[in-house]
Amino acid sequence: MTPDETFVELRDGRFKIRVLSAGEGDPVVFLHGAGGLFWDPFLDAIAAGHRVVAPEHPGAGDSQGLEHVEDLWDLVLYYNELLDHLELPRVSLLGHSFGGMVAAEIAATSPERVDKLALIAPIGLWLDEHPIPDISGVPPERIPELVLADPQGPLAALMPAPDPSNPESLFRAAMTMASILQFIWPLPDKGLAKRLYRVKAPTLLVWGGQDRLVDPAYGDAFASAIPGARLEVIDGAGHLPQLEQGERTTAVVTEFLG
């Protein structure tokens, strides 16, 4: 499935945001992680039964407006504006990693606009016994070791990566990473843990059993903090269960979304 690509402008052109969308049915908004926005077979499968809308974070890829977002709260307000602009007053939110953190913040601070909440290996909490590494200092060639259960497997070769011989490609990848990392650190100070009790939407948490970036212990922490949340651990997957164990992850998420 080839998604539609549009650019949305907000605040008199201060934001110019790339949005991918496909499918029909109840809306599901997908918020991507630090690796950037890519349409993959997982989103294809979700779009088979829903209207999937996937906006790119400001400053990532081809999207502009990062300079108008100072902190995480600014980002949450921005996403509420974007949903209003897209005429999506109530949606299901599907977020991966950093996108999961943002989705959880939206569900906690604007519970009336979230129908269901599906979080795949979200960040946002901190456990001293399982510190999350700062990937800004990790060489690109070592990323598969952190995010894949099998860093030598075929998926490692397919992971999107900048062309080391192309300065523009390297710059865009660095900007995408920087546009997201600025909202993450210092992670313990963001305060999500004290807001998760406000989530009212039915919540699904999906975690790779071999996640070396965000330890599966965080799945238990999120499940304990969000009322009624359900945790599904996918064996044989790391931080990208929707890609590494796509069939099982897709089945769990599509069953939850209905």
Can you name each region flagged by the protein language model?
Residues T2-D4, S165-K194, R198:
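Hydrophobic, aromatic-rich cap/lid helix
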Residues D12-D62:
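Conserved HGGG/HGGXW glycine-rich cap/lid loop of the alpha/beta-hydrolase fold
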Residues D12-G13, V53-L94, L243, A251:
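Active-site loop/oxyanion-hole signature of alpha/beta-hydrolase fold enzymes
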Residues G95, G99, A103:
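Gly/Ala-rich beta-loop-alpha elbow adjacent to hydrolase catalytic centers
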Residues A104-T109, D115-L146:
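Flexible "cap/lid" loop of the alpha/beta hydrolase fold
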Residues V199, L205-W207:
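Short beta-strand/loop motif that positions the catalytic acidic residue
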Residues Q210-V214:
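Acidic catalytic loop of the alpha/beta-hydrolase fold
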Residues A229-G258:
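Catalytic active-site module of serine/aspartate enzymes centered on a nucleophile-bearing elbow/loop
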